Amino acid sequence: MAALVDAGALLTYRAAWLRDEGERLETPVRVTTEAAMAKMTATENAQRVIDMALQMHGGLGVKVGTKVESLYRDIRSLRIYEGATEVQQLIIGKAVLQS
């Protein structure tokens, strides 16, 4: 689980670093693809992690008011907000085909 969380975090840090480097060098850097990769990976990995947590907790994991149940609802909405996973895949695919 920790590796999945770290993978999303590292891609997010990479996209932010590229953006900062572009500002520091005063050259516009497009980080759309990196941001899409980070968002897609982070949200999909978060969904996998929360699914594993639900599996570990069994029936108590879906009980209203528990932390796992709350996280499951939160993660599900994050996968849709700011572009669903399929939209992120289209952005990434378009960039790969253009390069």
Regions found by a protein language model. Give the residues of each.
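Alpha-helical interface subdomain recognition
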Residues: 1-99
